[in-house]
Each structure stands twice: as C-alpha cells, then as structure tokens.
Amino acid sequence: MRKNGGIFKNKVEEDIEMKIYHAQVNHLENPMGFRMERTVFSWKVKDAEGKKQSYARIRVASDAAMEHLLFDSGEDDKASSLFYPVKLDLEPRTRYYWNVEAGSDAGETAVSEVQFFETGKRNEAWTGKWISCDSKENRHPYFEKEIVPAKEVAKARLYVCGLGLYEVYVDEK
C-alpha cells in the first residue's frame, strides 16, 4: 500500500492506475446550449502515486474520435486542473469534443474519456413565433404545440426562450 498525501487521491492498491474524472467546461459536465464566450476547462485526478500534476494537455476536436483537432495545448507544465482557460473561436449551435491528458511528478499519465460541450445561439435572430395568452385572468396558461416533421429526424435541438418558468416535453418525456 502507498502512503496517503499530495493533492491527488492516492491509490490503495498497487495495480490501480491514475485516472481523470469530473472533467468540466465552465464548471459543468457536458454543457449544452451556452454562449461559451469564455471557455474554461477543469478536471480532477485520483489514484495517483504522485503528489502533484507535472503537466496537462487539453485537446478540442470537431469529432468524438478526436481526429479533427481544433485546439491542442501541448504538454503545459503550468496548467491548473482547477482553472484552465482556452481562447477558442466557437461556432454557434455546434458540438465540440474534448479530453485532457495529465501527468504526475511520479511519471504517471492518464487521459480522460472524451467529453463534449455544445454552444447555443449567438447573435442570431429568433425565427420562431411568439405565443401568449389573450386572457386577462390571473392564472397560469398552458400552451401546447404539436410538431410533425416532414421526414424522419436523425438529430434535432430545440432552443426555447421564455419568461418565468417553463417545461418542454418531447413525446411526453
């Protein structure tokens, strides 16, 4: 067994490898629909023999296989796992994939699972029709809209804007 210490959660048994977990963008795991004017990555490391991180490498890609890289920090020995800002030129309504590789002062390395973040609308007009209630009564209106697509949908995203509280259901879910 190894002694406890350092900033990492340490191993209890020798055959456990260093792992990266709780990988986040702007303090959220796999965020969707945000403006992302500033992109900050963070992560945690566990089961490391080392006492501190020796480097980190952030990669951002347009595909989940991480083959089409849009950003690669390289091995940055000054990277903080708590706050790693990256200046990215992000497109609106686009999904990006990312991962982090980190090394410890004991020579260990780990790579996180591929995560994602998705940007929302940005400087775009809302093209939907506004709906409202004609009644002057002081009550809580309920609106329902059935949408029947002209062809089979493989993937869709619904952007909703509303005042107060609202809920959205698709296929009663």
Which ranges hold each PLM region?
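Short, Lys/Arg-enriched N-terminal segments with co-localized hydrophobic residues
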Residues: 3-17
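Pro/Thr/Ser/Gly-rich low-complexity, intrinsically disordered linker/stalk tracts
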Residues: 18-48, 118-122
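Predominantly extracellular/luminal cell-surface or secreted proteins
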Residues: 28, 46, 59-63, 101-103, ...
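Short, conserved beta-strand segments of beta-strand-rich sandwich/propeller modules, principally
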Residues: 40, 95-99, 155-157
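Recognizes extended acidic, P/S/T-rich segments that occur
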Residues: 51-95, 101, 105-111, 130
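Low-complexity, Pro/Ser/Thr- and charge-rich linker/hinge segments at domain boundaries
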Residues: 119-140
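Short beta-strands within extracellular/lumenal beta-sheet-rich domains
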Residues: 137-149
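Aromatic-lined ligand-binding clefts that engage carbohydrates, nucleic acids, or primary amines
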Residues: 149-150, 154-170
